[in-house]
Swiss-Prot record:
Primary subcellular site in the record, as a coarse category: cytoplasm
Keyword Calcium found: no
Amino acids binding ATP: G11, R72, Y73, G102, D103, G104, S105
Family: Belongs to the phosphofructokinase type A (PFKA) family. ATP-dependent PFK group I subfamily. Prokaryotic clade 'B1' sub-subfamily.
GO biological process, one term: fructose 6-phosphate metabolic process
Function: Catalyzes the phosphorylation of D-fructose 6-phosphate to fructose 1,6-bisphosphate by ATP, the first committing step of glycolysis.
Keywords assigned: Allosteric enzyme, ATP-binding, Cytoplasm, Glycolysis, Kinase, Magnesium, Metal-binding, Nucleotide-binding, Transferase
GO cellular component, as recorded: 6-phosphofructokinase complex
Reaction equations catalysed: beta-D-fructose 6-phosphate + ATP = beta-D-fructose 1,6-bisphosphate + ADP + H(+)
Protein's name according to its UniProt entry: ATP-dependent 6-phosphofructokinase
Domain of life: Bacteria
Source organism per UniProt: Streptococcus sanguinis (strain SK36)
Residue numbers binding ADP: R21, A22, V23, V24, R25, R154, G185, A186, D187, K211, K213, K214, H215
Residues given in the record as substrate binding sites: T125, I126, D127, R162, M169, G170, R171, E222, R244, H250, I251, Q252, R253
């Protein structure tokens, strides 16, 4: 394989630039040419494909976001969209593609491989909800950003003896809430993977103030409900007059990546190039027990594949991601 391309797709995540840098420089060191596909699959179809060299990716390791830009392009799920993209790949002499993004991006990588263009997925999302890996690129930075914000909110919360409901990102996963909540000493952490009783939350808040606590911090994963809705439920269940709500929002997707995300992204990007050089496609890289691994994107659970097809042709996750609820137990045991 002499010429490959790299793209980023879906929501951006800190560390994507570090992964792109690793792909480009590892490929060059292996004697390969590298092209950047701008604006994800939409850019592939539009022919936004340009050569990259070592200088192109200089000084981007510390930058958040993705300098290749990203876009959601649902049309690539259709054969017509895939064939248009493949036509552009052929036009530019590209033989393999590294796709950095979430599970939707993986589906595109799988389709490219089926059409004869080996593609390797690299997990880039702050949500940490991709199967086949312990951690995704951007998660550590998002947790650190959320933790820093929660620390600041605690300062003002203590000054006024207030309760704060702080909503963090994560889509349907509670990983950011759990990690940021524990790291910031949150009093309550509410995640989609675990049920809760609003009356028990209210009782815990009141008990905390009775013990002399100066604040009460509730970290809420967005996959449960909005912070405003949760606050209304608290007010309905008890006297919560001095209650404030904060939605951290897209600040969690930006910023310079942490050292861990930079190293993780570099390892994953380089490993993806190694696989393409060996002619391997239709797989996604990951990290398990601090070791690089790869898993088939499509197949059976027994084969270790991430996704499978139903009889109706629908793509389903073989082993859906769930946040580690041992962390929830830990938080309860140390917040007394």
């Amino acid at each position: 394989m002499k010429r490959i391309a790299v793209l980023t797709s879906g929501g951006d995540a800190p560390g994507m630039n570090a992964a792109i840098r690793a792909v480009v420089r590892k490929a060059i060191s292996e004697g390969m040419e590298v092209y950047g596909i701008y604006d994800g699959y939409a850019g592939m179809v539009a022919g936004e494909i340009y050569p990259l060299d070592a200088t192109s990716v200089g000084d981007i390791i510390s930058r958040g976001g993705t300098f290749l830009h990203s876009a959601r392009y649902p049309e690539f799920a259709q054969v017509e969209g895939q064939l248009k993209g493949i036509e552009q790949l052929k036009k530019h002499g590209i033989e393999g593609v590294v796709v950095i993004g979430g599970d939707g991006s993986y589906h595109g990588a799988m389709r490219l491989t089926e059409h004869g263009f080996p593609a390797v997925g690299v997990p880039g999302t702050i949500d940490n909800d991709i199967v086949g890996t312990d951690f995704t690129i951007g998660f550590d930075t998002a947790v650190t950003t959320a933790m820093d914000a929660i620390d600041k909110i605690r300062d003002t919360s203590s000054s006024h003896r207030r309760t704060f409901v702080i909503e963090v990102m994560g889509r349907n996963a509670g990983d950011i809430a759990l990690w940021a909540g524990i790291a910031s000493g949150a009093d309550e952490i509410i995640v989609p993977e675990e049920g809760f009783k609003i009356e028990e939350v209210v009782e815990s808040i009141k008990n905390g103030y009775a013990k002399g606590k100066k604040h009460n911090i509730i970290v809420l994963a967005e996959g449960v409900m909005s912070a405003d809705e949760f606050a209304e439920k608290l007010k309905e269940a008890g006297d919560m007059s001095d209650l404030r709500v904060t939605e951290l929002g897209h600040i969690q997707r930006g910023g310079s990546p942490t050292a861990r995300d930079r190293v993780l992204a570099s390892r994953m990007g380089a490993h993806a190039v190694k696989l393409l050089k060996e002619g391997i496609g239709g797989v996604a890289v990951g990290i398990r027990n601090e070791q690089m691994v790869e898993s088939p994107i499509l197949g059976t659970a027994e084969e270790g594949a991430l996704f499978s097809l139903t009889a109706e042709g629908k793509i389903v996750v073989n082993n859906p991601h769930k946040a580690d609820l041992d962390l929830a137990d830990l938080n309860r045991s140390i917040n007394i």
